[in-house]
UniProtKB/Swiss-Prot annotation:
One of two assembly initiator proteins, it binds directly to the 5'-end of the 23S rRNA, where it nucleates assembly of the 50S subunit. It comes from the Bacteria. InterPro entries: KOW, Rib_uL2_dom2, Ribosomal_uL24, Ribosomal_uL24_CS, Ribosomal_uL24_KOW, Translation_prot_SH3-like_sf. One of its GO terms (biological process) is translation. The lineage of its organism: Bacteria, Pseudomonadati, Thermodesulfobacteriota, Desulfovibrionia, Desulfovibrionales. This is Large ribosomal subunit protein uL24. GO terms for cellular component: ribonucleoprotein complex; ribosome. Part of the 50S ribosomal subunit. SUPFAM superfamilies: Translation proteins SH3-like domain (SSF50104). It holds the Pfam family ribosomal_L24.
Amino acid sequence: MKQFRIHKDDKVMVIAGKDKGKIGKVLKILRNKDRILVEKVNVAKRHVRPNPYRQQPGGIIEKEMPLHVSNVMVVCDACAKPTKVGYRYTEDGKKVRFCKKCNEIID
């Protein structure tokens, strides 16, 4: 299984595409497609048919569409900048992620 340096509930910034510069929270990671869903970013309108069995009304809904993982960067809470993420081990042997700009632990 692929290892992404981006995890669910991380704050990320879009660095390429039509939503460049927007910041949002990661909702879901689609590892087999190298894509992630980011809250209120890359929103598209979808036409939905009514489904009486699920009590779902029809109409036009706005839905987040997946972004490629290479088009986003993690935003560090300490320095509030988009940054690369590295891994290191703490004294007790636990593997943690850290910000490569300010050296603070992200997890």
